[in-house]
Design a protein with these regions (language model features):
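Short polybasic linear motifs
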Residues: 13-16, 20-21
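An N-terminal, well-structured beta->alpha segment
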Residues: 32-133, 225-259, 270
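Ferredoxin-reductase
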Residues: 39-43, 111-188
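Gly/Ser/Thr-enriched, mixed-charge loops and adjacent short helices
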Residues: 63-68, 72, 181-294
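Short, small-residue-rich loop/turn micro-motifs
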Residues: 76, 120-122, 173, 291-294
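Secondary-structure transition/capping motifs at alpha-helix termini
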Residues: 107-111, 136-145, 163-167, 211, ...
Length: 294
């Protein structure tokens, strides 16, 4: 009986210690995300629009915690998350931070002179995020080749190989809901980064812990320095010509192009212009696009 009592006492003490440790972790966690929230509210680094968004959730503890309890993870596929203010959201600051990590990796690889190609899709803030990535690269001495409007991911892959870039960035969240956006990294072979590069880049991104160490510059200064260059029609033409080389039976297209009717639904996506262009250049005269999905 005495032995059972001692055993029960030991179990109780262990339970209390676990609860105390858990409570301490919760307090530390709460302090951490609240400290981050206050930092974003008070530090001059963050713009007024971001601060106003955060002020609106001042009474919503759960929302504050969800936005700040961790950093938005940079995984093997890059970034992906809900758009909004906070360390666990897609915004210009988390995009800059991720880009600084990628820039650090590129510099260590000696690839600054090759530059980086950047494309983006039709999601909310995609052009802005692409610009922020480009200006961070430029501030690190890495030239950014930025598409002048949205382009499909395969064309980004083509562009970075055509231009001889060391890396490429696509701002997209693929199939995720509209409140999401993302950021994918490609390497000089035109494919998404794979092991061991993906983990090496992740390590560089995770080492960027202070927003004030992230470099950026104005677009005017970047363009004047030759570190920001728009790309577009010249890449489109080269891409279309390469696509035409992949046609298996061009003679069949010539036979049916005048009469074949095609309905195309772009779903508001990046394929809208290039698909219609290649079909037109191949001679298809009856291509109908669903207006509500342009």
């Amino acid at each position: 009986l005495k032995k059972m009592h001692c055993s029960q006492g030991k179990t109780d003490r262990q339970g209390r210690k676990r609860r105390q440790a858990s409570e301490k972790m919760e307090v530390a966690k709460a302090m951490n995300y609240m400290d981050q929230y206050k930092f974003w509210l008070e530090d001059s680094y963050f713009d007024e629009g971001t601060k106003e968004e955060l002020r609106k959730i001042a009474d919503n503890q759960a929302e504050i915690e969800d936005r700040f309890y961790k950093d938005l993870a940079f995984g093997t596929g890059g970034l992906r998350g809900v758009i909004g203010a906070g360390t666990n959201r897609m915004n210009i600051y988390t995009v800059r931070k991720a880009t600084q990590g990628l820039a650090n990796y590129i510099l260590k690889q000696g690839g600054a002179e090759k530059g980086v190609a950047i494309a983006y899709d039709s999601r909310y803030y995609s052009p802005e995020f692409a610009d922020e990535a480009a200006l961070c690269m430029a501030a690190n001495g890495i030239k950014a080749y930025v598409f002048d409007e949205l382009r499909p991911t395969p064309e980004l892959s083509f562009a970075l190989r055509t231009l001889g870039c060391i890396s490429g960035i696509v701002v997209t969240a693929s199939h995720n809901p509209p409140e999401y956006n993302g950021y994918k990294v490609y390497w000089e072979d035109g494919a998404q980064v794979t092991a061991p590069k993906d983990h090496e880049i992740i390590d560089e991104v995770e080492h960027v812990t202070d927003f004030h160490t992230v470099k950026t510059m104005s677009k005017d200064d970047a363009i004047e320095a030759g570190l920001y260059q728009y790309i577009g029609e010249e890449i489109d033409v080269a891409y279309m010509e390469e696509l035409k080389k992949q046609i298996i039976h061009p003679e069949i297209i010539k036979e049916v192009a005048d009469e074949l009717k095609i309905v195309y639904t772009p779903f508001h996506g990046t394929g809208n212009k290039p698909v219609r262009r290649i079909l037109a250049e191949l001679g298809f005269k009856h291509v109908y696009v669903v207006p509500e999905q342009e």
